[in-house]
Amino acid sequence: LLFPLATLQLNADQPVERNAENIQDLNPDKRFIFMPVPRRRGPYGSVHRRRGPYRRHGNCFCPSG
């Protein structure tokens, strides 16, 4: 599948709208969105919690059995 190179080129004459300019218009309390930190998961997914008969292997707790 081939495309002409003209379709892939950017037009340098058009100004690019920057997000930083748009962010300055917002309320300072609404500038940042809360993103929770992903937690590490072991080979058993979210089973790695200290509930039930679990055995410690390094930094994780695996089901004993």
From Swiss-Prot:
Sequence positions bearing Serine amide: S64
Primary localisation category: secreted
One GO term describing the cellular component: extracellular region
Signal peptide: 1-12
Tissue specificity comment: Expressed by the venom duct.
Propeptide residue range(s): 13-48
Keyword Secreted included in the entry's annotation: yes
Compartments it resides in: Secreted
Record text about domains: The cysteine framework is C-C.
Subunit and partners: Homodimer; disulfide-linked.
Family under the similarity heading: Belongs to the conotoxin M superfamily.
The protein's name: Conopeptide Vt3.2
